[in-house]
Amino acid sequence: VNIVLSVVLGVLGVALDAVGLLGLQGKLRRNRFVGVRTAAALRDEETFALANRVAGVPNVAAGAVAIVSGTMAFVMADLAVTAGIIGLVGALTIAFAGGIAGSRAAALVPEPVKPKGCGGCACGGGGCSPLAGL
């Protein structure tokens, strides 16, 4: 039991550390699988990068907690399940809090301004023509 628990926590820790470091460096691109994936964060690349930069430090900390608790579960055979559960809950709580912070940061970014002007063929009366203002 303690070997499986240690491996699961170790893999979770490495994954959280990798996502956190990529987020901190701004190298995590929008995707469907990892990172802060709220509607506000997925609006554009810059907002996604900001949200994951904010969530990066908590994700790295959560990864460290998972790795340390996995190591403790391996070393302390009699308390492996207790150390593993406490570490898992702690790591997921820290990662979740980081995701909330990243989501809130993304929500504070104003919507990008859309260019004004004609959006297609619906401009009647020469509205899109350079001579329309004459």
Segments from the language model and where they lie:
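Alpha-helical transmembrane segments of multipass membrane proteins
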Residues: I67-M72
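Cysteine-cluster motifs in flexible loop/terminal segments that predominantly coordinate metals
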Residues: V113-L134
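N-terminal leader/targeting segments and the first structural element of proteins
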Residues: V1-A61
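Hydrophobic alpha-helical transmembrane segments
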Residues: V1-L9, A80-G90
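Juxtamembrane cytosolic interface motif at the C-terminal end of transmembrane helices
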Residues: L22-G23, A73, I100-A101
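Alpha-helical transmembrane segments and their immediate juxtamembrane interface regions
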Residues: I85-G117
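Short helix-capping/hinge motifs at transmembrane helix termini and TM-loop junctions
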Residues: G26, M76-D78
